[in-house]
Amino acid sequence: MINAFALENARLTRLDEDNLSTLNKAIWIDLVEPTSEEREILQDGLEQSLASFLELEDIEASARFFEDEDGLHLHSFFYCEDEEDYADLASVAFTIRDGRLFTLRDRDLPAFRLYRMRSRYQRLDECNAYEVLLDLFETKIEQLADVIETVYSDLERLSRVILDGKQGEAFDDALGTLTEQEDMSSKVRLCLMDTQRALSFLVRKTRLPANQLEQAREILRDIESLQPHNESLFQKVNFLMQAAMGYINIEQNRVMKFFSVVSVMFLPATLVASTYGMNFEFMPELGFKYGYPMAIGLMIAAGVTPYMYFKRKGWL
């Protein structure tokens, strides 16, 4: 799908999708899972070739940030959620050529939706492709800040459940949610680092107007301020995970201790029963009238005595 936007009164205005001849007026062309026909339209009409989705997965810096005859290229990760609402990252290709921004992605992304909604009312100061690019990055950082706040709130709730130490369904659910928070934080960290590298490359390779240069530096400062917060969440996740494992180990040790003490407690009684269960021909107690009650009494005494001792020691 091709989404094309042109400038009208310093605002982004969406162009008619059916009228592809208007693409020459576009300042921003956003492609979402473009078909081969749509790629050919761009190639024939604007002489612009697009990266393949396989190239978007490359993580080497030389493959993600470079400049060639087709323009300035940036590949950047955007935070999103998959079909099962788990944290995910989508790689977006940005290309700036002849004053026009091309974006290529394989799915709809929250940051793009939010920016398109804002662009209906937001005026552009410099009215160029670099401003659209920086605004998209700025929207992405705002989204990441919201994700960090969400993780923080969830960890506050989980900490009360885990540090309470009472194992049960709520405790098990908290462990599962904790792993999801760790995954979210790791993806936010990767996204922040990737955006930082992309903006640093952009500042080095282009001569941005003063306003946009300051905007880029402001975004970089926002990233630097968010990174310590995200790292502190990582540390809190690790602390809660270690605390949860500690409580689980304590509970397992308590169970093993109980069974160990119980087995030792009944060992003397088992010894008495084994003694009188032997099949020797001459056993005086077998002819004793009260031999059976005596054996039962010995077994009870052999069991009760260790129990009372262990109880006094606090082992039970």
From Swiss-Prot:
Site (Essential for ion permeation): 253
Motif (Probable selectivity filter): 277-279
Catalysis: reaction(s): Mg(2+)(in) = Mg(2+)(out)
Quaternary structure and interacting proteins, as annotated: Homopentamer. In the absence of Mg(2+), interactions between subunits are weakened, and dimers, trimers and tetramers can be observed in vitro.
Swiss-Prot/TrEMBL domain comment: The central ion permeation pathway is formed by the first transmembrane domain from each of the five subunits. Mg(2+) binding strengthens interactions between subunits and leads to the formation of a symmetrical homopentamer surrounding a closed ion permeation pathway. Low Mg(2+) concentrations trigger both a conformation change within each subunit and a loosening of the interactions between subunits. This results in an open ion conduction pathway. In addition, this results in a less symmetrical shape of the whole complex.
Signal peptide: none
Cellular component, GO, one term: plasma membrane
Segments crossing the lipid bilayer: 258-278, 290-310
Stated name of the protein: Magnesium transport protein CorA
Localization annotation: Cell inner membrane
Purpose: Mediates influx of magnesium ions. Alternates between open and closed states. Activated by low cytoplasmic Mg(2+) levels. Inactive when cytoplasmic Mg(2+) levels are high.
Domain of life: Bacteria
Gene: corA
Family annotation (NCBIfam families): corA
Bilayer topology: Multi-pass membrane protein
Entry keywords, A to Z: Cell inner membrane, Cell membrane, Ion transport, Magnesium, Membrane, Transmembrane, Transmembrane helix, Transport
Single GO molecular function: magnesium ion transmembrane transporter activity
Pfam families hit by this protein: CorA (PF01544)
Family: Belongs to the CorA metal ion transporter (MIT) (TC 1.A.35) family.
Biological classification of the source: Bacteria, Pseudomonadati, Pseudomonadota, Gammaproteobacteria, Pasteurellales
Annotated CDD domains: EcCorA-like_1 (cd12835)
